[in-house]
Swiss-Prot record:
A motif (Nuclear export signal) lies at residues 150-160. The modification Phosphoserine is found at S158, S293, S301, S431, S435, S437, S440, S446. This is Interferon regulatory factor 5. Belongs to the IRF family.
Amino acid sequence: MNQSIPVAPTPPRRVRLKPWLVAQVNSCQYPGLQWVNGEKKLFCIPWRHATRHGPSQDGDNTIFKAWAKETGKYTEGVDEADPAKWKANLRCALNKSRDFRLIYDGPRDMPPQPYKIYEVCSNGPAPTDSQPPEDYSFGAGEEEEEEEELQRMLPSLSLTEDVKWPPTLQPPTLRPPTLQPPTLQPPVVLGPPAPDPSPLAPPPGNPAGFRELLSEVLEPGPLPASLPPAGEQLLPDLLISPHMLPLTDLEIKFQYRGRPPRALTISNPHGCRLFYSQLEATQEQVELFGPISLEQVRFPSPEDIPSDKQRFYTNQLLDVLDRGLILQLQGQDLYAIRLCQCKVFWSGPCASAHDSCPNPIQREVKTKLFSLEHFLNELILFQKGQTNTPPPFEIFFCFGEEWPDRKPREKKLITVQVVPVAARLLLEMFSGELSWSADSIRLQISNPDLKDRMVEQFKELHHIWQSQQRLQPVAQAPPGAGLGVGQGPWPMHPAGMQ
């Protein structure tokens, strides 16, 4: 008995857009795709929007579908047809390419034949047409395509079943509306963390011996005429005194689809809770909202999202983020605990090796996100040349939609990037990318009680650095720069760190 053999999906592949698209225009096989001048410099692409113009009679024979098939993003008989996604893929490719320039876009209201006209550029667009490095706004005609995709999104948003309050717990306290931040403000840190009543927890404020530690390690001495080159003095200082690294610092970047990111840095030794709610965490509601010693970080308001549909769907997810996602620091490891009803997916150094499969965070289950010990081991191997790539340290969360998947992260409604600052600094030091200046780094002094094994790792990194320096010409030290390790010169005065 004959059985049909399933067709394997075509893996995505890189295709040069210019020769492929010019060949398609020359082929005349797609209705409306044609040259508009004799020199074959300008061509027209029909550009219908389903929300305004209805389905096309030639919907199955479009340049958008052909590009999706050519790049391996659509396999007939395997993938579900998605004309809006095909159109967005080609639009993004044209926007990024230096070989094409948009000449005319429209008319877009209710035309019988909406279209775009592109110019084939010989040497890329003229300098006057250059765009800012990052443009998060939608161009003309793009909002309709975004809405086409958003219309299909709500049924697929990942929300768990409704949750009832446990009868043994007191009802949560509502925060007075007058204390809410303005709707257009960036992410708000809701005050300093409350002290942990546990006798084992470190007291709030500076750790014991803080001033003595500063006077010992950061005593400036006579300042040289100019600062040493990047990493010349500061790198060994930090490696010999690893407690100077901001081990508890986390850089958090919130991103709503198509909007500029909003970022902040938290320095709480316990971690933080990411949430969106008027419900206030209290000592009596630890089971609902986690420890009050965590930094309380509220998601930014979605009110500046211009698309009504996108803002509606984003609010659908934010409405079930009141319990939040906990990022817990434990030793030199970072963990996540999902309390919220909204499902959360993630990728990062400790994620599953199957990068193409969605990776959910199970509810109320501690999930390891990052290990500094493992990062240091991988950094040592990389510096020795035993691995080809530096160790990863960035962590990405996607709220309410599966991740990783074939959809780019920029198309997700809500994403959050988390970066352990200590890992980023160490990697930048060894790669030479760190620019040391008074405002480039804000050092935070943490508890110096590190494990012996971690101290050995720093010693080995310091040894690697010294070996690298022997292979480079020695720079002439400025007069007065002969300072001992731990004495400076530092680019900021200790008084600025109190």
